[in-house]
Amino acid sequence: MTTPPHLSDRYELGDILGFGGMSEVHLARDIRLHRDVAVKVLRADLARDPSFYLRFRREAQNAAALNHPSIVAVYDTGEAETSAGPLPYIVMEYVDGATLRDIVHTDGPMPPQQAIEIVADACQALNFSHQNGIIHRDVKPANIMISATNAVKVMDFGIARAIADSTSVTQTAAVIGTAQYLSPEQARGDSVDARSDVYSLGCVLYEILTGEPPFIGDSPVSVAYQHVREDPIPPSQRHEGISVDLDAVVLKALAKNPENRYQTAAEMRADLIRVHSGQPPEAPKVLTDADRSCLLSSGAGNFGVPRTDALSRQSLDETESDGSIGRWVAVVAVLAVLTIAIVAAFNTFGGNTRDVQVPDVRGQVSADAISALQNRGFKTRTLQKPDSTIPPDHVISTEPGANASVGAGDEITINVSTGPEQREVPDVSSLNYTDAVKKLTSSGFKSFKQANSPSTPELLGKVIGTNPSANQTSAITNVITIIVGSGPETKQIPDVTGQIVEIAQKNLNVYGFTKFSQASVDSPRPTGEVIGTNPPKDATVPVDSVIELQVSKGNQFVMPDLSGMFWADAEPRLRALGWTGVLDKGPDVDAGGSQHNRVAYQNPPAGAGVNRDGIITLKFGQ
């Protein structure tokens, strides 16, 4: 199987950026969002292995849940259809930068302050992942990038777990390749927790400070042995310029016993910040040669004084004894595993076949179940089946079943859940809610809820869509949201008087109105100014209504009050306001002697708008 040049009609694959234990990473172009991304694709030779296939998919989901500025973001996951079957991939943030491994190999050790800042950011990323239940398991300089803007980015969350949990012999090299950063518990094959990542990050800090990892050997086995048995040389003895306070932080992170390490990455970060600001860390100070000489000379000159170091030595001996017991337990465990393997081989090839009880692995992760069965000497094969109650990648049952007695070396079929059965969501558009539920139920779906959304008047009370949408596949246990039209959305018309047309339309857009017409009206307001709307302001109408904007022609002036004025005075005043029309002189009226020849009546009245070429009627007193 080869990797196709396009994935899901969206991602154009470019150059290969690198290879991992189970994947290859390509530079790619997201043609939908027009941005560069990095795409991790499961290796073609592993895509047909159900264990790797399911674990890669699950780890992709875990990684996508980690949204943190110091963690390479996961944008999308999916599967590309190839001639040989589905090929899963993960779409990630493309980081333009270099890994710590490349930086140290090119430039050598980093200044302590810079190293502290980088690892402190990495601590934040790891602490966030631990709080979300994800252990990295493969912290190393190659998995920490520094971007072109000096941002720290931790990569490959969870992928190392897929390799470490696998029983495939072909993956041995992938584990050995990171032996220089394995925690002692990883090297012994014990279960690990967040403190294992703290140890590995301590190895990273050691290397970027000194230019070399804490342990170097001729083979991965010898390096792993040193992680379990040997104490690291303090970084300050490997490279100058490193303070004893920073030594203390590194060596506490590299404690053999997890109980003696930082219990969280946040604790390690807090000590790094203390050292960065010139304060002593909480980690115990590492004695220099001068300190030891001073203590010895002090002890020689105080004969007869009670020795407190005897108790310390005794405690240390007890600790070492405990460590020795732990190492013997590990040796015994290894011998036990070898014994089981030898017995299984004898039963298979050289002796009589014996019956072995099938362990109960129901509900376990498939990779763990495979290990448990193969440790009993069984051959295994996996069969994927949908199941509505067992989570994906977990065991539904085995054939033969749990506790059955079968011959050693027989094949056990492991039925692995792919999650609930997937069905295509039918199109229920334009149906009412009841009929839509009936159609969805007939397609196998069981849970529904209604949501209302604005619609055209014709679709009021009708289905306008579903979530997931029609023709998409969904688990039959998922809740299908049926979206029912509630008719046109209504809004209150805002007051836009006094605004020019363009501004008025933008303000109406904010309220959801998008349809407009204009009507020019006589008005003394400036030309082009909105003097009103139809429907009027504050009216509540559907947002798809046409809003008429009444726009001033600017062809009027405001009629002044001419009462008591002689015509000789009134006319110049009107002309000054732009009036070009003619006077309609009405019959004189009886207004008393004092109003003789003065304006006693006018039309239009004072304050009204008058067209500049309009007729004005005046009546004078007699």
Curated annotation (Swiss-Prot):
Catalytic activity from the UniProt record: L-seryl-[protein] + ATP = O-phospho-L-seryl-[protein] + ADP + H(+); L-threonyl-[protein] + ATP = O-phospho-L-threonyl-[protein] + ADP + H(+)
Modified residues (Phosphothreonine): T170, T172, T308
Disordered, as annotated region: 381-404
Subunit structure: Homodimer.
GO molecular function annotations of the record: ATP binding; metal ion binding; protein serine kinase activity; protein serine/threonine kinase activity
Keywords: ATP-binding, Cell membrane, Kinase, Magnesium, Membrane, Metal-binding, Nucleotide-binding, Phosphoprotein, Repeat, Serine/threonine-protein kinase, Transferase, Transmembrane, Transmembrane helix
Organism superkingdom: Bacteria
Post-translational modification: Autophosphorylated. Dephosphorylated by PstP.
PANTHER family membership: MITOGEN-ACTIVATED PROTEIN KINASE KINASE KINASE 20-RELATED, SERINE_THREONINE-PROTEIN KINASE NEKL-3
GO cellular component, one term: plasma membrane
Limits of the Protein kinase domain: 11-273
Record's protein name: Serine/threonine-protein kinase PknB
SMART domains registered for this protein in UniProt: PASTA, S_TKc
Residue stretches spanning the membrane: 329-349
The protein's role, per its UniProt record: Protein kinase that regulates many aspects of mycobacterial physiology. Is a key component of a signal transduction pathway that regulates cell growth, cell shape and cell division via phosphorylation of target proteins.
Binding positions for ATP per the UniProt entry: 17-25, 40, 93-95, 140-143, 156
Binding site for Mg(2+): N143, D156
Biological process terms in GO annotation: regulation of primary metabolic process
EC number: 2.7.11.1
Topology, Cytoplasmic side: 1-328
Residues spanning the signal sequence: none
Record membrane topology: Single-pass membrane protein
InterPro entries: Kinase-like_dom_sf, PASTA_dom, Prot_kinase_dom, Protein_kinase_ATP_BS, Ser/Thr_kinase_AS
Assigned protein family: Belongs to the protein kinase superfamily. Ser/Thr protein kinase family.
